[in-house]
């Protein structure tokens, strides 16, 4: 016979697995549609018209039209395509289901059009809203917070292809007690995360790791080098933190989202022309291309880091629907490669992983997620102790500092983005 604690944990197991699978399938469908549209916009259409896909006019035109299209969706869709991600944390309160169609369309347009944002925030919003709405009907005795936790865990597992990130994130939020141990509370979320990760793995494998030279043995000087790299990444990230709310306030004085996003898309197009095609899109595939290109110099990596960070700020400030984690990882990789080229004595494994740790920490203010992203992009167990040590001064530097988020005006309704 199972102990009552075990039976309690099993109660939500089936819903957790179902939510994890559904979270992954929603992500897969959205990404597939966006991929097809991206191929149409950036491969087939310019080829048919006899235009180079890296033509400045094409890049500016596609991104400007993408901004206008997203603005029209936000202006006229029911629920205005959900909340502005610049004003929301990664895991937020559930939104009305009526806002989800517009949010999904806005996300797909942004991903396909080359906007420098990832899918994580809108997908999280969609999955949480559906889990809460459907779960409240099927199992009304389960509170909204439980459904929110299961949906966010399933989404994290699906996004990263592993339940490890969910385990790390929720271990700091689901505090255990003498009555309910931590792992009792983690059981159902980890079931959802595992189901999401396994479902994603059936269709594609998220490819985060980079072909960077193996790091052999940790030296004391490497800790100092890593801390300096993380501090440089944090300094760059804090510039973006300072710029985001100011640019957001300036752009949204125009009130009309079509105009705001059209201008935002035009600026992104100009940045894309300067940085080239590798500086477009969410950044995961592009960072693989960046590492594979042996022709890039220190100044090239610096330019890519600056352009991508600027594009991230512009996209978020304009109101495009997307997340900031994936493009931030690209910025970290570019910064790390730049610093390694500048000081070759410091291994690239250290510069890249510590730069990712610093910039993701600025964007998310989540130590576990920052460690996870650094560890999966540069998968080397020898680096783990160094990253844990470097995290300490990095966390001190950011203590009490503002987050990369815009404070929503009090008079503005929570989901009215007109």
UniProtKB/Swiss-Prot annotation:
Task: Extract the GO molecular function terms from the UniProt entry.
Answer: chloride transmembrane transporter activity; monoatomic ion channel activity
Alphabetical list of Pfam families matching this protein: Voltage_CLC
**Which UniProt keyword terms apply here?**
Cell membrane, Ion channel, Ion transport, Membrane, Transmembrane, Transmembrane helix, Transport
Q: Its GO CC terms?
A: plasma membrane
Q: Does the keyword Transmembrane helix apply?
A: yes
Q: Which domain of life is it from?
A: Bacteria
Q: Return the SUPFAM superfamilies for the record.
A: Clc chloride channel
Q: Which InterPro entries match?
A: Chloride_channel_YfeO, Cl-channel_core, ClC, ClC-type_chloride_channel
Q: Where in the cell is it found?
A: Cell membrane
* Membrane topology annotation: Multi-pass membrane protein
Kindly list the residue ranges recorded as spanning the membrane: 10-30, 54-74, 99-119, 120-140, 149-169, 186-206, 223-243, 258-278, 300-320, 322-342, 343-363, 371-391
Q: Which family is this sequence assigned to?
A: Belongs to the chloride channel (TC 2.A.49) family.
PANTHER family per the UniProt record, alphabetical: CHLORIDE CHANNEL PROTEIN CLC-E (PTHR43427), ION-TRANSPORT PROTEIN YFEO-RELATED (PTHR43427:SF9)
The record, for HAMAP family, names: CLC_YfeO (MF_01115)
Put simply, this protein is called: Putative ion-transport protein YfeO
Which species does the entry assign this protein to? Escherichia coli (strain ATCC 8739 / DSM 1576 / NBRC 3972 / NCIMB 8545 / WDCM 00012 / Crooks)
